[in-house]
Amino acid sequence: MLDWDSILAYNTIKVVRIRDRRLGILHLIFMIAIISYVVIYSAIIKKGYLSIEEPVGSIRTSLWSPNQFNGNESYCKNNAKPYPYEKLDCVYYDDALALYPIGDDVGFTASTRIEISDQKANCSLMNPSCKFKTFNYSNVYLADIESFTVLIDHTMYAPSSQIQFNGGDLSGYVLDQNGNEIQLNESVNVIGVEGKPDVLEISKLLEFAGVNLDDPSLTNSSNPIRYDGCVLFVFIEYSNTFSYDLNKIKYVYSIKLVDDTIYNIPEVVILDDVNSRLYYKRHAIRLIFIQTGVIGSFNFQSLLLTLVSGLGLLTVSTLIVDQLAIRFLPQRKSYSSLKFQTTESFKMKKKIVNDDGEDKLYHNIEAL
């Protein structure tokens, strides 16, 4: 016959105070380590009380030409200085001619070389065999593009916490080639100064990316980067978790060159009519802005989850000490008998009043 009392027995917790310094010290060490990890490391150092979100943002850029061009570039044909690559004619375009496309809200393009083709279609474009023919072709460098300056106006917004700031209201930095955060407040280059917009010379921007336009192209070593163009990622990372004051927000620029890429973009200018056009093939420095970061705000549920996670560790530590006591120590049998106790079954017992007037439970009446 099945003993359902044994099968469906209920296990309850029994507190046994084992006077053994080995177990006590081990359990105390576990407790201190777990509390230190949960409270000091997870909750305080790692800021487990914060709800973290990634901000979104917008970018506006402007290109400014220098007040005075250098006029002594070794890559220009009219310069006698040696240059390790083919020299081209140079043109001194202002910012309106050097920038294309205009109004790009996610990137920025500064031309370094332009192929200019004067094309005409001496036929009707309604004819499927009609093609444009090139009558004049020129290939030129945009001289002294490194002296142009870029204004970067950026704004960040964290939807959940509704934190919003313009870059001009924040402190900021830019990472140099060694990964150091530096702040610029020079006559031309300004980065991270509150109340001032961020402005960088293209030469400085390339320097932070470790790029020289006269280095070999990333896809054809017989040409310089100036000839083929390049693509740079400009990361703007916002954070208010670098200190314990959540009202302090900073941003950091990091500029990375995209390997094995060149950049060019076509531009068509219609002249007298659609049959007459100038075709520009621009090779350029392409900047792609990526706004990211970590914005934190106090959240009680996050704090509660951080603290509750420690309860599981406490349970594991108690289990380890218990198993050590009942399975490995020399006194394991004694400790096991103290920890585990099985009651007798009350299934078929009857209540009897004895001669002293006390209630007694017996399995059968013959036990009297």
Curated annotation (Swiss-Prot):
BP GO annotations: calcium ion transmembrane transport; cellular hypotonic response; regulation of calcium-mediated signaling
Origin: domain of life: Eukaryota
Gene Ontology molecular function, alphabetical: ATP-gated ion channel activity; intracellularly ATP-gated calcium channel activity
Tagged with keyword Transmembrane helix: yes
Cytoplasmic side: 1-24
Membrane-crossing residue ranges in chain numbering: 25-45
Claim: Transmembrane is one of the keywords in the record: yes
Phenotype when the gene is knocked out: Null cells are still capable of osmoregulation and do not show any noticeable differences in their sensitivity to hypotonic conditions. Quintuple p2xA/p2xB/p2xC/p2xD/p2xE null cells displayed slight delay in their osmoregulatory response, but are still capable of regulating their cell volume in water. Extracellular purinergic response to ATP persists in the quintuple null cells and p2xC single null strains with no alteration in the kinetics of the response, but the magnitude of the response is lower.
Record-level GO cellular component terms: contractile vacuolar membrane
Keywords assigned: Ion channel, Ion transport, Ligand-gated ion channel, Membrane, Receptor, Transmembrane, Transmembrane helix, Transport, Vacuole
Region described as Pore-forming motif: spans on this chain: 282-295
Compartments it resides in: Contractile vacuole membrane
Role summary: P2X receptors are ligand-gated ion channels that play a role in intracellular calcium signaling. ATP does not evoke inward currents in p2xC. Not essential for osmoregulation.
PANTHER family named in the record: P2X PURINOCEPTOR, P2X RECEPTOR A-RELATED
Family to which the UniProt record says this protein belongs: Belongs to the P2X receptor family.
Official protein name in the record: P2X receptor C
Organism: Dictyostelium discoideum (Social amoeba)
